[in-house]
Amino acid sequence: MSVELWQQCVELLRDELPAQQFNTWIRPLQVEAEGDELRVYAPNRFVLDWVNEKYLGRLLELLGENGSGIAPALSLLIGSRRSSAPRAAPNAPVSAAVAASLAQTQAHKAAPTPAAVEPIAVAAAEPVLVDELAEPSSRDSFDAMAEPASAPASSGRAEQRTVQVEGALKHTSYLNRTFTFDTFVEGKSNQLARAAAWQVADNPKHGYNPLFLYGGVGLGKTHLMHAVGNHLLKKNPNAKVVYLHSERFVADMVKALQLNAINEFKRFYRSVDALLIDDIQFFARKERSQEEFFHTFNALLEGGQQVILTSDRYPKEIEGLEERLKSRFGWGLTVAVEPPELETRVAILMKKADQAKVELPHDAAFFIAQRIRSNVRELEGALKRVIAHSHFMGRDITIELIRESLKDLLALQDKLVSVDNIQRTVAEYYKIKISDLLSKRRSRSVARPRQVAMALSKELTNHSLPEIGDMFGGRDHTTVLHACRKINELKESDADIREDYKNLLRTLTT
């Protein structure tokens, strides 16, 4: 198929369209012929999507009418005809919009002819899986070039050709399919967050909107977000579910401004069924991004579309974030994801070992869980090191092998979490002196922090009760035992003590 035929059809389309539409959407297209295939390049994803939805059907019709009477082979790509070969898009099916355009083209015909184009059978798009936890770059999200994949042609009397479009870029999910509710280990620390995420996944638009998950790194916020997205796609494969990091939203907006395509940017992000944005704290002090996200957020909620956000802190505590955004984040449900307790850490290790088809003795899992307390990511990293060490050495996993494979990490943990460090941290937190913790003073303002420090020492170090007592002014081990039991009781009944303990635990282990 010749470029001249394309130019001829474009001139015919020019007569049909208002000048502004033609100059905005058709004029920027570049074309090159390769054998019987015609490759059409759009400057960015938004132009590609718009041409795909609004003009592709008519262009195909004109090409068929003015060509050989056979439906043309057409590729719609992002890039330039002078650029290097585009990267391959993984298993990208023809988008539903193309099929709709082709169906509309056929409907315009009075009767079937050899030039008629029948709708192409479209397979449900699989969510695109990025490599493990790696984020796709902002370039990939906005203007990455991709080699289109062929869609299967449906049977029919007319000769069928594949219309190839850079499929799946339109609403690429970027979901990790291994992050599901089944692979998420539930415990006291994440029970509420998991329940809220499931409610949103099972009843989208009727649950909590927005759902805001916050907590430290590596605690499972991203896992839950992906689990919701995967469940939504499982229920409805045609759902437009988009997961991205907040920095990518900013990068897409900047690119849209550079290309004078901000309206298309708005249309893209406001047309999703569910928008999942990670690490919203990166919007801080980015006024233009906050302004655009504010309007996108409002449009999605007004349209009944689901929004899920995560952050490393409570939304009200994010400095540099506009108050109107903080206020709107509170419209739905805000849930904290806490560091996993010992039992949950053991369960996570056992589940990960089972997934890796590795036998992990319970005492070995308990040993690792006792010493790696900060977050799930570090816990999994430690387990991978142990498994690798076991494999390379040809030995079963034992506590001795764990000590060998994690000796540097364990040494660092022991150095960081010492009784001296705990005493100093607790004293600073309660604004008292370390000497007060070691003294015989029994006033509540000193006794309660001392009990908290003893309980933390019992949980975070390997010292015995008598050793801990000695380091707290020569106290008896029964005093330490009483302090630990008292703090455990207060954590259940006293919200202030519970919050203090969590804050101190987080400070000491991160």
UniProtKB/Swiss-Prot annotation:
Pfam families xref list: Bac_DnaA, Bac_DnaA_C, DnaA_N
Positions of region (Domain II): 87-173
Any one GO BP annotation for this protein: regulation of DNA replication
Region (Domain III, AAA+ region): 174-390
CDD domains: AAA, Bac_DnaA_C
GO CC annotations on file: cytoplasm; plasma membrane
Naturally occurring in which organism (per UniProt): Pseudomonas putida (strain GB-1)
Keywords: ATP-binding, Cytoplasm, DNA replication, DNA-binding, Lipid-binding, Nucleotide-binding
Entry keyword Cytoplasm: yes
Keyword Transmembrane among record annotations: no
Coiled coil: none
Residues involved in ATP binding: 218, 220-222
Region (Disordered): 140-160
Gene Ontology molecular function: any one: lipid binding
Main localization, broad class: cytoplasm
Composition bias type Low complexity, residue spans: 144-157
Record function comment: Plays an essential role in the initiation and regulation of chromosomal replication. ATP-DnaA binds to the origin of replication (oriC) to initiate formation of the DNA replication initiation complex once per cell cycle. Binds the DnaA box (a 9 base pair repeat at the origin) and separates the double-stranded (ds)DNA. Forms a right-handed helical filament on oriC DNA; dsDNA binds to the exterior of the filament while single-stranded (ss)DNA is stabiized in the filament's interior.
Similarity-based family: Belongs to the DnaA family.
Region (Domain IV, binds dsDNA): 391-510
Protein name: Chromosomal replication initiator protein DnaA
InterPro entries reported in the protein's UniProt record: AAA+_ATPase, Chromosome_initiator_DnaA, Chromosome_initiator_DnaA-like, Chromosome_initiator_DnaA_CS, DnaA_C, DnaA_dom, DnaA_N_dom, DnaA_N_sf
Annotated localization: Cytoplasm
Region named Domain I, interacts with DnaA modulators: 1-87
PROSITE patterns assigned: DNAA (PS01008)
PANTHER family listed in its UniProt record: CHROMOSOMAL REPLICATION INITIATOR PROTEIN DNAA (PTHR30050:SF2)
